[in-house]
Structure formats: C-alpha cells, structure tokens
C-alpha cells in the first residue's frame, strides 16, 4: 500500500508539499499530488517531515530483564518517538558477547518489525574488561554487528582498549566507550559538587569521564581507529573532544536529552528516578553540552533509554538502579533545549538525530535525504503541539521518566519504516 503525506514541510523549510511513498521509497514530492486509489493518507498540514531518527544507545533489556523492557515494548516506544533504527546495548543477561545473543536480538527485532534493532556486541567477555570478545564472529553473523561497547562499565584497561581499537579497525566496526575511570567513582552516586556535599552523597568527579575521553582519543590516534564516546556529560569533555577533532583524531560523541535539560539540582528530592550514569551535573555543564551540540563538537543525540521497574527505582537514592527512559521524550526535550532558543533548526535536528548517527554507525539506508528514490524511513512532527509526560502512559514496560508531569513541545504524528506506517497519532500500527 502507498502512503500520501499531505501538506508537510520537509526539514521545516519552504512551502508545504505532498510526499507520496510507494514500495518502501519516496516516489513523488510536490504540491497537490493525486491520491492513489489504495493510498493511506496522512493529513500533515503544517507539520515537519524529517528522516527517521537513529538512536545509537538504548537498553532494551532482552534477554534477561524482560520485566523492565523487552524488544517489543522498546520498539514500540522507539516508533512512537520517531525512531526507525535503534542500537541495543550489550549489558543483557546473558551478555551480548557472542553471535548466539546478538543474532537472537536481531531476529527478535525483525520479528517485531517496528524499528530496525541493531544489537551492540560487548567489547570484552562478560563485560569483565579482561578478554576481548570474538567481534569478527558477531560481525559475520546474521546481525552483522557493527558497534561494540561494554556500556554500563568502562573498558578501563588501556592495553585492552588499545587492542580493541586495533581489532575493530581491521573489521571496519566501531568501539563505543562508556567513559568512566572506575577508581574515581567507587561508591559515588552524584556529581561531585556543592549539591552532593549538601546532600551527603559521595561525589562523582568530572575527571572520571574526562580522563578516559583524553586517553581513548590518544589510543584511537595511535591505532588509526574510530572511537565513539557515549553520553558526554561534562564541560571539560567538550574541550577534550574539540582538541581531539582539531588534531584530526577520528572521535565522535553523543549527548543524552536528560543531560541537555536537567542538572544536579534535581537530586534535592532524593528521588531515585534522578539517579543516572553519568550523573546529572551542574547547570553550567548542560549549557556547555547544548553549545557543543550546536557547534558540532558533539555529533549526535542518543537517548541512553534505560528502563527500570518500580522496585528498582522507588528505593533510597544510593540503592536505585541508574538510568532513565528516553525514547518517547527525546525529540521534545531536544526541541525545548535546542530549537526553541534558536541553537538548532529543524534541518539541524535531522543532522543530530538521524544523519550523523546513521553515518557514525554506517547504516546505508538510514539518515538519507528527503528526495525521490530514497528509502522511506520518515518521521512526521507537529512542531506546534504540546503534551504532558505521564510515565504510566508511555509504551515502555517501565515508567522511570525524569520528565513526569512536564509539559513539552512537539509531538511525533507519524513514523514510517521503509514505507510502512509504524506509529500514527500516538498509537502503534502493527
């Protein structure tokens, strides 16, 4: 079946046009297109058309913790949030450190069919940091794993990290680093600063992140490798990234929506929903991250969508599992922090939420231009809408959103994966 999107503005620019999607591709773009007899018509008058979003950093919890999330519920949240591809991190149970697990995740994603689910393979066996996994076998499997990370923990041994970068270069795959020097964060739950001191919480210094980013930039330089930095959170990290890029080092980085909007003032409530890794930092860090995203020092937005069940969050702060939901709120938070103040345009949103992450992960069919003949992986956005976040109403199996009861701008009105409508007007289209 073909789909006709009526009255939309590609990238939020120019006059309103109609976009006809047929056979999984953009077939026509122009004003007042004829409606095919079998077309599914989407009235998107005045809405913005963007390439489907790509999330380099999600936790779908399958296998092992399906009580918090699984690939079906996570895919639904992704589609409703405008995503057409997500990367599922390896810290599952069992760990995704072999083709048995990565191929299972891939096949489950294909079975659900709402987004392309790309499994991330572990860098080290069991995330233990001691022995490299068989990256080549995972890359050669059905999932064709193209990104590897021990996210949740840092590959802290510099020799192991150097070998991983060398190995990855030979395979043409990417290492994504959770930048945290573990010896600086023992027992830490909050950003090291006045707020943590006042609340009596052990502090997590910026240097724990910055030192690993600097080290891995140098290792990538010497190995001639690419390295990607997960969830940048500190102003100092921005300076290191800028220096590394100026040196010609092949380093990329992501920032989460929650680090763009929130800061450690939230911790005063001792609410476990605000515990996240890396921690919410000071307002000055959030300002630096926003500017870095606008300037291209930080390449993309990634959600670090991390569902946790109520019994894992509704506990004392130190006992709460770190992580926040992000897939359905990401666009709105980015609009509030970046578009509303004029730091990014809608075309820039396409760059940081679709084109750049697709390029980093080397996905040939995602993040493509809105042109005739291109794959119809598309997101339609109502830029003028507002909505109030209610965790219980989100598609995730968990409800641990830090944006509970917030009024946020912009809504996703439709998502198309290879021409198939996967989400429309807040509902999943199976």
Curated annotation (Swiss-Prot):
For this protein, what is the EC number?
3.5.2.3
Sequence positions that bind Zn(2+) 1: 57, 59, 151, 304
What GO cellular component term, any one, is given?
Answer: cytoplasm
Kindly state what the record says about how the cofactor is bound. Answer: Binds 2 Zn(2+) ions per subunit.
Please name the pathway.
Pyrimidine metabolism; UMP biosynthesis via de novo pathway; (S)-dihydroorotate from bicarbonate: step 3/3
Which terms does the UniProt entry file under GO BP?
Answer: 'de novo' UMP biosynthetic process; purine nucleobase catabolic process
Principal EC category: hydrolase
The residues listed in the UniProt record as binding substrate, with positions renumbered to this chain, are 59-61, 91, 277, 308, 322-323
Co-factor requirement: Zn(2+)
Q: Which domain of life is it from?
A: Bacteria
Where would one find the signal peptide in this protein? none
Keywords, A to Z, come to: Hydrolase, Metal-binding, Pyrimidine biosynthesis, Zinc
Q: Would the keyword Transferase turn up in this protein's UniProt record? A: no
Q: Does the keyword Ion transport apply?
A: no
- Which reaction is recorded as catalysed by this protein? (S)-dihydroorotate + H2O = N-carbamoyl-L-aspartate + H(+)
Q: Where is the active site?
A: 304
Q: Which family does it belong to?
A: Belongs to the metallo-dependent hydrolases superfamily. DHOase family. Class I DHOase subfamily.
UniProt name for this protein: Dihydroorotase
Q: Which gene encodes it?
A: pyrC
């Amino acid at each position: 079946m073909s789909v006709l999107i009526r009255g939309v503005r590609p990238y939020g620019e120019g006059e309103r046009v109609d976009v006809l999607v047929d056979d999984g591709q953009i077939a026509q773009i122009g004003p007042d297109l004829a409606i095919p007899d079998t077309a599914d018509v989407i009235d998107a008058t005045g809405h913005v058309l963007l390439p489907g979003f790509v999330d380099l950093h999600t936790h779908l919890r399958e296998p092992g913790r399906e009580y918090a999330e699984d690939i079906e519920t996570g895919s639904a949240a992704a589609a409703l949030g405008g995503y057409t591809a997500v990367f599922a991190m390896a810290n599952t149970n069992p760990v995704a450190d072999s083709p048995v697990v990565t191929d299972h995740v891939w096949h489950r994603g294909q079975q659900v069919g709402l987004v392309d689910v790309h499994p991330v393979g572990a860098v080290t066996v069991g995330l233990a940091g001691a022995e490299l996994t068989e990256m080549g076998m995972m890359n050669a499997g059905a999932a064709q794993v193209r990104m590897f990370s021990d996210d949740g923990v840092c590959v802290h041994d510099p020799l192991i990290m150097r070998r991983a970068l060398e190995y990855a270069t030979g395979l043409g795959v990417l290492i994504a680093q959770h930048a945290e020097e573990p010896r600086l964060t023992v027992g830490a739950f909050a950003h090291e600063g006045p707020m943590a001191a006042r609340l009596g919480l052990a502090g997590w210094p910026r240097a724990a992140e910055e030192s690993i980013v600097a080290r891995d930039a140098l290792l990538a330089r010497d190995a001639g490798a690419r390295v990607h930095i997960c969830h940048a959170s500190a102003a100092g990290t921005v300076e290191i990234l800028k220096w590394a890029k100026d040196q010609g080092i092949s380093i990329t980085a992501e920032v989460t929506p929650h680090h763009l909007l929130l800061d450690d003032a939230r911790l005063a409530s001792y609410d476990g929903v605000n515990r996240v890794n890396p921690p919410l930092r000071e307002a000055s860090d959030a300002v630096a991250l926003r500017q870095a995203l606008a300037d291209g020092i930080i390449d993309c937005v990634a959600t670090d969508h991390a569902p946790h069940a109520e019994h894992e969050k509704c506990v004392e702060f130190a006992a709460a599992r770190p992580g926040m939901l992000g897939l359905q709120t990401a666009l709105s938070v980015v609009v509030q922090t970046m578009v509303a103040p004029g730091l990014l345009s809608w075309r820039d949103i396409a760059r940081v939420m679709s084109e750049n992450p697709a390029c980093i992960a080397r996905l040939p069919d995602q993040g493509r231009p809105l042109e005739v003949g291109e794959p119809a992986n598309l997101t339609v956005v109502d830029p003028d809408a507002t909505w109030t976040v209610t965790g219980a109403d989100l598609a995730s199996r968990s409800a641990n959103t830090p944006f509970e009861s917030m009024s946020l701008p912009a809504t996703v009105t439709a998502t198309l994966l290879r021409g198939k409508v996967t989400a429309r007007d807040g509902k999943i289209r199976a």
